[in-house]
């Protein structure tokens, strides 16, 4: 096995172990044993558990960021919402280990975390909403509030669905999109609390 192949093997095994045991529960010894190598091989490639974890998190961040960005690039407003919701739920379903690592095992002080990824998504969604708000006569400066709400709703539901997996992805996506779209389409230009 070449050095590059060994590195990729360790990343793959590390990803699975971090998802299964969490950062704190994972040891270099466990990763090495599952890879069929000695601990010094892991240290040689990554300097330790922290180095391997950083590579795994960075790859997952880039993958999920691309999924979100790609889903928001084209289409009508509704299509973008549908594409983004389906993309995130598909990632949760197909890349469960990666999603688990991002949402359940974030280390304090990490520069790149699920929280920073969500902030980036909020920026993208808010930008799209600003354009839509201008067309509807709604103050575009309020787009950030709605961007936070929409991304938070999708993110929280995706985390819930990670454990539940019922109903299936399409049903969950349909209901998220229904709430997002119909909530946005029925927006009042100057909303008030309590029906005032």
Each model region followed by its residue ranges:
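Helix-turn-helix
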Residues: 9, 13, 17-51, 55
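Hydrophobic alpha-helical connector segments
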Residues: 55, 69-94, 147-150, 173
């Amino acid at each position: 096995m070449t050095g590059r192949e060994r590195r990729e093997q360790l990343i793959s095994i590390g990803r699975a172990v971090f998802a299964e045991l969490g950062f704190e529960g994972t040891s270099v010894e466990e990763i090495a044993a599952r890879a069929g190598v000695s601990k010094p091989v892991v240290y040689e490639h990554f300097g330790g558990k922290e180095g391997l974890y950083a590579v795994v998190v960075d790859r997952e961040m880039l993958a999920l960021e691309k999924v979100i960005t790609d889903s928001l690039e084209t289409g009508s407003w509704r299509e973008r919402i549908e594409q983004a919701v389906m993309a995130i739920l598909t990632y949760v379903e197909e890349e469960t280990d990666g999603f688990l690592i991002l949402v359940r095992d974030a280390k304090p002080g990490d520069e790149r975390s699920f929280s920073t990824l969500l902030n980036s998504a909020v920026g993208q969604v808010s930008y799209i909403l600003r354009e839509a708000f201008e067309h509807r006569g709604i103050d575009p400066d309020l787009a950030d509030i709605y961007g936070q709400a929409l991304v938070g709703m999708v993110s929280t539901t995706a985390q819930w669905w990670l454990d539940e997996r019922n109903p299936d992805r399409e049903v969950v996506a349909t209901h998220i999109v229904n709430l997002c779209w119909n909530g946005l389409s029925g927006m009042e230009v100057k909303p008030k609390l309590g029906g005032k």
